[in-house]
Swiss-Prot record:
Keywords: DNA-binding, Host nucleus, Oncogene. Residues 28-80, 101-143 are annotated as: Disordered. The keyword tRNA processing does not apply. This protein is synthesized as a Gag-Qin polyprotein. Signal peptide: none annotated. Its main location: host cell. One of its GO terms (molecular function) is DNA-binding transcription factor activity. GO terms for cellular component: host cell nucleus. This is Transforming protein Qin.
Length: 387
């Protein structure tokens, strides 16, 4: 009987152990283990035989651990994300793998991009500035092709009163030519030198009633035939034929308008405008020059007394408001200084070709006054020629 029981026990135990280890969880295995131990306690002989043919119970946890390892192997592998430091290290390794040539190429690409950005910004700035000035290139303004004399003449001719102070000339040039806003010291000195040396520019003293400082600069009337050359942009003088036509037109204009003296009481200097019509309100007749030369002074004409024309008789006698007359002038009753002033004023108010009899022995020829170039020359004793 014992042999049969042993054989049956041997046949059954491997099946139970195999099914428990592979199909049942650990908790069920522990329960089964407790039940199996209880069964072995009832059959000590069988327990002895089981202990002889099967491994001890402590081997079961090892089998459970092996099963857990198998489950872990079957599960998908989940790797943690790489750290930032690892990424940088990988990039550095990649660059190192490229070698020095790769690094140099990358630097060149960066430089080209930066240069293109700068160029685009510069072009945008230039477009904005070109709409305003249109002369700026490479960050600097182009120098205008005009000479300093031409710039001065443009400034004076475009002024309303045909005269400007030195500062007024500077302001005109800087306003119309942005190139001269820089390096003021150099070109301003050149402007002063050209004003002093060129005979086309005449200095006019400022009237004492005129506030401000600095003298005025005007164009000499003889410079009317001066123009700015189109090729050299320098001052040029018209040909003789052109000057004759200009003088003829000027003489016709003066004849039609008429020139006489105007009262300006209390004035010591009289800056005359070239196109100012001089007419005395109390003159009984209008006297004008019949010549074709310039009949107006560009310099201020000093005089100490105001001349008024009371009447023009058949004997062509002129008198002044303060009692000055040609007779007194010739007879020496007037001081020498007043003699020059009065003679010049009287001669300027008499048309050319008209002789003024003086005490029956002398005649006054007004054409001896040199007004052709705008220079006022006064009478000397040689201006009085005996008849």
């Amino acid at each position: 009987m014992l042999d049969m029981g042993d054989r049956k026990e041997v046949k059954m135990l491997p099946k139970s152990s195999f099914s428990i280890n592979n199909l049942v969880p650990e908790a069920v295995q522990s329960d089964n283990h407790s039940g199996h131990s209880h069964h072995n306690s009832h059959h000590p002989h069988h327990h002895h035989h089981h202990h002889h043919h099967h491994p001890p119970p402590p081997q079961q946890p090892q089998r459970a651990a092996a099963a857990e390892e198998e489950d872990e192997e079957k599960a998908p592998l989940l790797l943690p994300p790489p750290a930032a430091g690892a990424l940088e290290a990988a990039k550095a390794e990649a660059l190192a793998g490229k070698g020095e040539a790769g690094a140099a190429a990358a630097e060149l690409e960066e430089k080209e991009k930066a240069a293109e950005e700068k160029k685009g910004a510069a072009e945008g700035g230039k477009d904005g500035e070109s709409g305003k000035e249109g002369e700026k290139k490479n960050g600097k303004y182009e120098k205008p092709p005009f000479s300093y004399n031409a710039l001065i003449m443009m400034a004076i001719r475009q002024s309303p009163e045909k005269r400007l102070t030195l500062n007024g000339i500077y302001e005109f040039i800087m306003k119309n030519f942005p190139y001269y806003r820089e390096n003021k010291q150099g070109w301003q000195n050149s402007i002063r030198h050209n004003l002093s040396l060129n005979k086309c520019f005449v200095k006019v003293p400022r009237h004492y009633d005129d506030p401000g400082k600095g003298n005025y600069w005007m164009l000499d009337p003889s410079s009317d035939d001066v123009f700015i050359g189109g090729t050299t942009d320098k001052l040029r003088r018209r040909s003789t034929t052109s000057r004759a036509k200009l003088a003829f037109k000027r003489g016709a204009r003066l004849t039609s308008t008429g020139l006489t003296f105007m009262d300006r009481a209390g004035s010591l200097y009289w800056p005359m405008s070239p196109f100012l019509s001089l007419h005395h309100p109390r003159a009984s007749s209008t006297l004008s020059y019949n010549g074709t030369a310039s009949a107006y002074p560009s310099h201020p004409m000093p005089y100490s007394s105001v001349l008024t024309q009371n009447s023009l008789g058949n004997n062509h006698s002129f008198s002044t408001s303060n009692g000055l007359s040609v007779d007194r002038l010739v007879n020496g009753e007037i001081p020498y200084a007043t003699h020059h002033l009065t003679a010049a004023a009287l001669a300027a108010s008499v048309p050319c070709g008209l002789s003024v009899p003086c005490s029956g022995t002398y005649s006054l020829n007004p054409c001896s006054v040199n007004l052709l170039a705008g220079q006022t020359s006064y009478f000397s004793p040689t201006s009085l020629t005996p008849q």
